[in-house]
A protein has these predicted regions:
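Single conserved hydrophobic/aromatic residue that forms the stacking wall/gate
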Residues: 1-12
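General structural signal for secondary-structure boundaries
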Residues: 8, 110, 122-123
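Conserved catalytic-core segment of NTP-binding enzymes
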Residues: 14-119
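Non-catalytic terminal/linker segments enriched in charged/polar, low-complexity residues
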Residues: 115-131
Length: 131
């Protein structure tokens, strides 16, 4: 059996074609559909998460993301990478998962997340430096 990394492109192509068919069915069934195309990404997947975002966006034109598993060793590097990758066409992150329970799914607040990432109080408002 080939390693998972070599399987990824084939499974992605299959999923992408299936998603395109679903999208076409939705468009035929209701004008303006689908209204949202949200991808849930495992925050521990690193570089694979970036490839998933690119592949799924190409297939169905994503409107947002949910990033899970940001409570362990994944401290948000995938968020920074996705932001860097998508500078010309930003993709909103609606929720982040910081645990195993439904209650651990939180609305994503970029400033709070950035403050926490660098060790500041999440509630600290930004300050302007005197020039």
């Amino acid at each position: 059996r080939p390693p998972r990394s070599t399987l990824f492109p084939y499974t992605t192509l299959f999923r992408s074609e299936e998603l395109r068919r679903i999208r076409r069915s939705q468009e035929k069934a209701m004008e303006g559909a689908p209204h949202e195309s949200i991808l849930v990404v495992d925050g521990t997947n690193g570089q694979n998460a970036l490839m998933q975002v690119e592949a799924f966006d190409k297939a169905v034109t994503l409107t947002g993301l949910i990033i899970t598993k940001l409570d362990g060793t994944a401290k948000g590097g995938v968020l920074a990478a996705i932001t860097q990758m998508r500078r010309e066409k930003p993709l909103p992150i609606y929720f982040i998962g910081v645990g195993e329970q439904l209650e651990d799914l939180q609305p994503f607040r970029a400033l709070e997340f950035a403050n926490t990432l660098v060790g500041l109080d999440p509630a600290t408002p930004p300050t302007e430096k005197d020039d």
